[in-house]
Design a protein with these regions (language model features):
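N-terminal zymogen propeptides
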Residues: 2-65, 109, 115-118, 125, ...
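Aspartic protease catalytic domain
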Residues: 2-34, 76-78, 86-91, 102, ...
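Eukaryotic endomembrane system proteins
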Residues: 158-168, 174-247, 253-262, 280-283
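Charged, flexible boundary elements
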Residues: 48-75, 251-270
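Signature of the N-terminal lobe/flap region of pepsin-like aspartyl proteases
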Residues: 55, 64-178, 182-186, 191, ...
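Beta-strand-rich binding-surface signature
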Residues: 68-72, 81-85, 92, 144-146, ...
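Short beta-strand-centered segments at strand-helix junctions
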Residues: 94-96, 197-208, 291-293, 387-392
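Membrane-interfacial loop- and helix-cap regions that link adjacent transmembrane helices
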Residues: 272, 309, 313-318
């Protein structure tokens, strides 16, 4: 999903069009990369099993006011930089592409010039992006795609393979050939941001992580650390954290399209809201957190009740987010207001055990440009999420969030996200 207030709930429909024939509102932003360089003599099977075999990417951006996080990937020969919106809620990575481009949005770099290495229609990566029974190969020599996002944006294109440039944390260079989308017809959504494309980090076979894992180059583990001060880092691999210090919960076996811990119970100030069975997903493609209409109304009622008699008054003139409050003077940081707000928590049930994911005020509030405090939790039902509940970037800040696809676990640990990791000891 991607980015801002509505992460990408991705609808993938492959149209099998001929490659040559294919002739913003910040309040509701969309929820929306030869194997080794000549300098390396190590084999992939050795690298994946030793320390330093993770790949780390610096992250740029913030929840507010930028409204999204992005990373830089280097693609092609010679390698060229592209800024991509990182999205754990969708699978396919794509770049705006000169194929030629029918419709492309303004971007920070020149359009990607695709290689001549087309992904054929019967390739497993192409098949993975079709619903069962809907994979029809009208043109068997290529894999055409159309992806649509909940903010109304879309990308139409064709899958190609090209060389990506990565570095392991031990310094070894890595140049795998991976599939990506060459998007030659883009329709911007309501949350359009000037980027070169989307970095799909979901659980599907087409994701960059899955492709690297299938080539035995990294563990099937992804994580990110988003700083509340802006920036952070993204990583592939499992040697940057001490697993014994991480809080873990199981991935749902009933909801396999996204990184979901299953259903949750909502707590406010240590007390149950009475709302249970809230189907929840983690999604870096959403700047903000979403609750279904019933949970959202219950939460806002509890917050308003808690603020009764206090010096905060609702700021109806501040349209930064759906609900804002003002004080006697403008606020400069969450520290100025956190005494008025209680900790929220989602309790995930795994068999007989329960795991709490706590949200301190820093994890669900922002200070607007007007100096008011605004609730960074929104009504997901109103923006098309129906009953789905979504943990967005605001609620994942200043902690390492880990998605271990090998063990089917989701984990988190408080962390300093301002520094790129060199070893797991930095999180002790």
């Amino acid at each position: 999903m991607r980015k801002g207030e509505v992460g990408f709930v991705l609808v993938v429909v492959f149209l099998l069009l001929g490659f040559s024939s294919a002739s913003t509102d910040d309040k509701y932003q969309r929820w929306r990369k030869s194997m080794f360089s000549p300098y390396s003599t190590a084999t992939s099977s050795l690298l994946i099993n030793r320390a330093g075999s993770s790949i780390v990417f610096p992250i740029h951006g913030n929840v507010y006011p930028t409204g999204y996080y992005n990373v830089t990937l280097f693609v092609g020969q010679p390698a060229k930089p592209y800024f991509l919106d990182l999205d754990t809620g969708s699978d396919l990575t794509w770049l705006q592409c000169d194929a030629p481009c029918v419709q492309c949005t303004p971007a920070p770099h020149p359009l990607y010039r695709p290689s001549n290495d087309l992904v054929i229609c019967k390739d497993p990566i192409c098949e993975s992006l079709h619903a069962p029974g809907e994979h029809k190969c009208e043109n068997p020599e290529q894999c055409d795609y159309e992806v649509g996002y909940a903010d109304g944006g879309s990308s139409l294109g064709v899958l190609v393979k090209d060389v990506f440039a990565f570095n392991y944390t031990n310094g070894v260079r890595l140049n795998p050939r991976l599939a990506l989308g060459c998007g030659y017809d883009q329709l911007p959504g309501t949350s359009y941001h000037p980027l070169d494309g989307i970095l799909g980090l979901g659980r599907g076979k087409s994701s960059i992580l899955s492709q690297l894992h299938d080539q035995n180059l990294v563990r099937n583990v992804i994580g990110h650390c988003l700083s509340g001060r802006g920036g952070g880092f993204l990583f592939f691999g499992d040697d940057l954290y001490d697993s014994s210090r991480v809080v873990w919960t199981s991935m749902s076996s009933d909801y396999t399209k996204h990184y979901s811990p299953g259903v949750a119970e909502l707590f406010f100030g240590g007390k149950s809201s009475g709302l249970k069975n809230l189907l929840t997903i983690f999604d870096s493609g959403s700047s903000y957190t979403y609750l279904n209409s019933q949970a959202y109304q219950a939460l806002t009622s509890m917050i308003k009740k808690e603020l009764t008699g206090k010096s905060l008054k609702e700021a109806v003139d501040d349209q930064t987010l759906s609900l804002c409050w003002k004080g006697r003077r403008p606020f400069k940081s969450i520290r100025d207001v956190k005494k008025y707000f209680k900790t929220l928590a989602l309790s995930f049930i795994n068999g007989r055990t329960k795991t709490l994911y706590e949200l301190t005020p820093e994890a669900y509030l922002i200070i607007s440009s007007k100096g008011n405090v605004c609730l960074g939790i929104l009504n997901g039902t109103e923006v098309g999420l129906q009953d789905l509940n979504l943990i967005g970037d605001i609620s994942m800040q200043d902690r390492m969030v880990i998605f271990d696809n090998d063990k089917q676990m989701i984990g988190w640990i408080q962390a300093n996200c301002d520094r790129l990791p060199k070893s797991r000891t930095m999180y002790m």
